[in-house]
Amino acid sequence: MKYKKIILGVALALACFSSLNANALTETKVKKTETQTAAPNVYWTDGYGRVSYTTNSIISPVVKIALKEFAGDMKAVTGFDAKEKSGAPIQIYQLDQLTNKEFSAVEKLGAPLHLIITAKDAFYIGTRKGKLIVIGSNARGTAYAIMKLSELAGVSPLAAWNDLQPAQRKSLYTPVDQQWIEVPRIEFRGLALNNSQWMKPQNYSRIARLMLRLRANTLWQVDGRHEAAYNKAVVDSFDICVAENYKVTEFVGKKHKKKHRKTIENVKLVCSDAQMEMSNLSPGLLLEMLNSKDYLESKNAQHGKSHRSAAHNDEDCAWIANITNPKQSTFQLAMMMNLAWNKNALKAGCKTYIQNTLNAFFGAITGKKIMPLMEEYYRLTSIRHSAYMAMPYGDTEFHSGEFGNELERFLYRYDLLKAKTESIEHMLPQNQKDGFFEVVKYPIFLAAFVAEKELEAQEARHIARPGLFNKDDEAKAAAAVSIDAYNKLKQLNAYY
């Protein structure tokens, strides 16, 4: 009997032990499952929606400017300025200014430093050990990375220039499996503001901020033809290179006080002949220019030699946009600079690129509604662009007596486009209307009024009998429509 009790006791003990082990294993599995299903994000914001960051001990002036811009961007998104704070979730490092101790700490993070450390203007953004790590190879690279954070938060690089308001957000985060490694393929990327009203002292800083957000690093002058006297203090603080006569000057060294001059052999100058403004280029035409060797120039070309280099290498040249008004060319500039960084930026096609840009500006739902407007706008301007509608190009080939009055049909298409544009404008929230006007409505209505002004004037000239214009009601009616379009065009430009 005693043996039975002993055996029963041992059996009960084993059962209890097995039950405890089973419970322990189950608990472990539950914890593991909970860990796996938990949202793997690194949050930029605290419980109040405030963004904070830390930096290494020494940073360059352009990085400080970028941080100030970032602070304002975060206020626009979350309602609070981004602040520097010990132990913050965002850690920012400028590689060429790190102390030995700081560099050792960065190495331990396991970030792919070898991919950016020897490249100019490159940067890395990714998550490491529960923090969002931002590393720039130099001053510009670090500043560009900070501006990339603003872009990831929903602030367009063109926001300040096109009155685009970012969507409000209570929290910001980055998934742990996401990272960005960006290295420019074109070393010198920039613009030449020739004979421009924008080259005034009060605009220097504004232009430099646009270049910072677009990740452009060069202001261009060629052979004294351009009268832009760039402000040295602004250029230096934003770490901008200045190029003249195919030689570019930039500051180098850890203290950033040594000047280095470099000769550039191949330069792609877009709209350098002033025949067409940068703002008039469609995405397709701009892409063709950037991909064609026919737009390459070199220093040798100035001495009568071929402007195309047999040893051309895209990664070894400069891309410069010749513009007179950057405010009207921001979309084209952004596209050009994206391609200067990433040759696959338009791999999915121009249509997809435009759609993604509109989505970023206005949201996916509104962007999808706007896309057909832009498609029709580019189709109509590809038939006859506004830049080639007026003198000195003479009358257009549009004919009112052939092909079912193609002149009136062309203008009718613009009337339909204007009506659709206004219909969408009425549905927009108030905070998107200014941005919509600048990005969508203004270029569409500008092209429509120019076409109406020029083509109706052409119609009046063609149908009026010599010496009898005052008695020709049809000709006078066409002339009146042309004058009305001219007045509307003046009002549109004044409002813009």
Segments from the language model and where they lie:
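Contiguous, structured surface segment used for ligand recognition
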Residues: N23-V183
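Structured segments of extracytoplasmic/periplasmic soluble domains
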Residues: E69-D81, K148-L152, L210, L214, ...
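Aromatic-lined carbohydrate-binding surfaces of glycoside hydrolases
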Residues: V51, N56-I59, V63, T78-G87, ...
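Bacterial N-terminal signal peptides
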Residues: G9-S18
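Stable alpha-helical elements in mature extracytoplasmic
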Residues: A66, F70, T142-A145, Y204-I207, ...
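Bacterial N-terminal signal peptides that target proteins for export
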Residues: M1-V10
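Substrate-binding groove of N-acetylhexosamine-processing glycoside hydrolases
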Residues: Y3, D177, E265, S279-N280, ...
